[in-house]
Regions:
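A conserved acidic beta->alpha catalytic loop
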Residues: 29, 50-58, 99
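Short aromatic/hydrophobic "clamp" motif used to bind/position activated sugar donors
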Residues: 92
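Glycine-rich, basic loop-to-helix element that forms the pyrophosphate-binding segment
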Residues: 71-87
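Acidic donor-binding/catalytic loop of UDP-sugar-dependent glycosyltransferases
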Residues: 56, 95-111, 183
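Short, well-formed alpha-helical segments that are part of the catalytic scaffolds
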Residues: 19-38
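A short, conserved alpha-helix in the catalytic core of glycosyltransferases
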Residues: 162-167, 173-193
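Short beta-strand/loop segment that forms part of the nucleotide-sugar
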Residues: 38-52, 69
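Conserved donor NDP-sugar-binding/catalytic core segment of glycosyltransferases
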Residues: 103-133
Length: 248
């Protein structure tokens, strides 16, 4: 049965740390895609959480019309949570600042919200540049994501009430916070007899910059440390260089 969705507001939260190279393009994509929400009679807002940037990220975000909030501790979980804390919408959409959602993707999100059967979800991803090993790894992730279902942090949509009931993203984790949140949302969805949906008809285009900024050896070393550390690596910011060393 379709949910009563008249008068909804969608809050789009964009965590950003030193994203001056991509933030304008990302926000323009979000703004263009958000017209879908207006067409179904919903309001929307765009919130950028400046995660202690040292470049022009906050200024560029404000110039694009986003509401900008500040989180002083460099951690993706804290940045998303800080943005969600000021969000006024009944639904939250988290989009990374190096990702570029399409109107077709937002239309799918709107349809899931209107269905009343979905508590939240994510989408498969597609790199904006083709690198063979990275493309293959992305395919593996997309298959795993749909099977589990696990949401990639680059794009997560969620009922705001459910997000707050779960306490948001874990502040213990510097990476893999999206998988942790996915597991907890899956548990809640079963209690509510709703679904966590991984969309796949219109994948999220996301930047392949990490593939070029960090060597294959560096990526493999991180995966090995993560495996041997049994997850402890995810709680150590210094070990998560590809997310926190500021290379852009």
């Amino acid at each position: 049965m379709a949910a009563m969705t008249m008068g909804l507001k969608i809050s789009i939260v964009v965590p950003a740390f030193n994203e001056e190279k991509l933030i304008e393009r990302s926000l323009q994509s979000i703004r263009d895609a958000s017209s879908i929400f207006s067409r179904v009679g919903w309001e929307h807002e765009i919130i950028v959480c400046d995660n202690n940037s040292t470049d022009r990220t906050p200024e560029l975000a404000r110039a694009k019309g986003a509401c900008v909030v500040f989180e002083p501790i460099n951690q993706i979980s804290r940045a998303r949570n800080a943005g969600a804390a000021v969000a006024q919408g009944q639904w939250l959409v988290f989009v990374d600042a190096d990702s570029f959602p399409s109107a077709e993707l937002f239309a799918e999100v709107a349809a899931q919200i209107q269905s009343g059967q979905c508590i939240g979800g994510g989408v498969t991803v597609e790199l904006d540049q083709s690198v063979r090993w990275a493309t293959e790894l992305t395919r593996v992730w997309n298959s795993l994501s749909r099977w589990r279902p696990w949401m990639a942090g680059s794009f997560i949509f969620c009922e705001a009430r459910a997000f707050r009931e779960l306490g948001g993203f874990s502040r213990e984790l510097f990476v893999a916070e999206d998988i942790d949140f996915s597991k907890r949302l899956n548990q809640l969805s079963k209690m509510r007899r709703q679904q966590v949906i991984i969309l796949h008809s219109h994948p999220l285009k996301t930047s392949a910059r990490k593939i070029h900024l960090y060597s294959l050896r560096e990526h493999l070393q991180f995966l090995l440390r993560s495996f041997l550390g049994l997850g402890k690596t995810f709680k150590n910011r210094k070990a998560c260089t590809a997310w926190y060393d500021g290379r852009r």
